[in-house]
Structures are given as structure tokens and as C-alpha cells.
Amino acid sequence: MEHYISLLVRAVFVENMALAFFLGMCTFLAVSKKVSTAFGLGIAVTVVLGISVPANNLVYNLVLRDGALVEGVDLSFLNFITFIGVIAAIVQVLEMILDRYFPALYNALGIFLPLITVNCAIFGGVSFMAQRDYNFPESIVYGFGSGMGWMLAIVALAGIREKMKYANVPAGLQGLGITFISTGLMALGFMSFAGVNL
């Protein structure tokens, strides 16, 4: 159990997808203007990562890995296209659920919801799972933790950006300039977790 808690804490804080690897920055910067929208997208990314990492773990171990189907047959060259296909299917299902049951959030996320399919944070989580050779329970914990870490980062940035509306930001830094600086400072703060030995 201690191993899984360590993996979860590492995925959320030490190896944060947004602030340690800078993955998923397009939606991270574009949707972080309001906390409510950022939280909704964070939940969507967490759900997609929490489902797609274990689902792709099963596909990788049962179909793509060397010798999984037939001894001597290695289908790992199909990793990228297969992983993206599984992620796309999961995002489509999530999009239909949000459209049906949460139309306000669906409209607020707009084009960024289908773009979760090609969000490099999602693909990065799946790729790290395959590269680090996580087993199925580890992939569940890692997928959920990576999503929670990305959500924590985008909600924190949205909170900072909402506060900055009332700050006296120099004209040359308004908009994305101060957002990049804020993201960099947040990343520096999260680097302090790198010294934590888990």
C-alpha cells in the first residue's frame, strides 16, 4: 500500500504533468482564466487519464507487447496509433456524457474538450506508463494521480489569474506574459518536491 501512496504523491507533486514536464500547456494556458472552467477541465482530464492509462495498460500488455499475442511477434511499433485511438474513444464518450448531463460545462469548455484527445499530458501519461512498465494497479494510481496533479496546477493558475485581474500589471506583461511568468514561478515551487525521497 505504501508503494501506491508513494506513486500517487509522486504523480501529483514531484512529476506534475504541467509543472514538471510542461505537458498540456495549450489548454493549460487557454482555459485557466476562470477557476470554475479550469476545475471542470481538470476533472475531465483526470477522468480521461484515470481511464485511459489503465485501459492502454491492458491493450499494451495483452496485445502490443513483444510476445503478448504470439511468441516472437512484437506489435509495439503500433503503440502511438493504438494509444491515441483508445484515448479518442474515451474522450468521445466523456464528451457525450458532458453534453447530455452537464451542458453548461460542455459549452464552457468548447473546442478544448475534443482537444483533450490530442492533449500531450494525456498521451504523456500513457507513454510514461508504457515506458516505466507499470502493472495494472500502478497504472490506475498513476493515471489518477497525474490527472489530479494537472488539475491542481490549472486550478491554482486560474486562481492566480483571477487575482491578477485586480493587480497593476505592467502593460507589456498583461495577458499571456504574466501568465508565463506565473507558471514558471509555480514550476519553481513544485521543483522543491523533487528533493522529497519517496
UniProtKB/Swiss-Prot annotation:
NQR complex catalyzes the reduction of ubiquinone-1 to ubiquinol by two successive reactions, coupled with the transport of Na(+) ions from the cytoplasm to the periplasm. NqrA to NqrE are probably involved in the second step, the conversion of ubisemiquinone to ubiquinol. GO terms for molecular function: oxidoreductase activity, acting on NAD(P)H, quinone or similar compound as acceptor. It is a multi-pass membrane protein. It comes from Yersinia pestis (strain Pestoides F). It is an enzyme of class 7 (translocase). InterPro entries: NqrDE/RnfAE, NqrDE/RnfAE_oxidrdctase, NqrE. GO terms for biological process: respiratory electron transport chain; sodium ion transport. This is Na(+)-translocating NADH-quinone reductase subunit E. Its EC number is 7.2.1.1.
